[in-house]
Regions:
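Short, charged interaction patches at domain edges and termini
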Residues: 1-10, 41-56, 90-120
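Short beta-strand and beta-hairpin "edge-sheet" elements
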Residues: 77-91, 96
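Broad gene-expression machinery/nucleic-acid interaction feature
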Residues: 33-35, 58-60, 103-105
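Mid-chain, well-packed structural core segment of small domains
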Residues: 55-83
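Small/polar-rich, solvent-exposed N-terminal microdomains that initiate assembly or binding
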Residues: 1-49, 69, 74
Length: 120
């Protein structure tokens, strides 16, 4: 399983739309009101014999929702689901809401050995 697949598997039971990097929509298509995107930076971890045996990913999951909607249960469900994964740490939650909508960033570390992601 890739790290992308693992993140999507954890998030989609709570927020059904979850994509890496950016949610793209076609011309005239209305994006969902609630969705998640995610991104991460990768660092070598568990270095020995001139090789990295693990990867540490600094992950950000972005949760978007309409303004003035109660999102506390969803945010805590996301936090708890992420924390329940053995390779993931308990995330912090940063409020990045602006006038266009609610935006919460769940930041955590993921440490493991994942399959490579095909970016083509």
């Amino acid at each position: 399983m890739t790290l992308n697949e693992e993140i999507i598997a954890v998030v989609t039971p709570i927020v059904p739309v979850c994509v890496p990097d950016l949610l793209g929509t076609e011309a005239g298509e209305t994006p969902p009101e609630r969705y998640c995107t995610f991104n991460y930076s990768e660092l070598a971890e568990g270095i020995g014999d001139n090789a990295a045996h693990l990867t540490r990913a600094l992950v950000q999951v972005h949760y978007f929702a309409p303004l003035r909607e109660s999102t506390i249960k969803t945010r805590h469900a996301l936090r708890d689901a992420i924390a329940a994964v053995d390779d993931f740490t308990l995330p912090s939650i940063e409020n990045a809401t602006d006038e266009t909508g609610q935006h919460y960033v769940l930041e955590f570390d993921a440490v493991g050995s994942w399959e490579a992601e095909d970016d083509g």
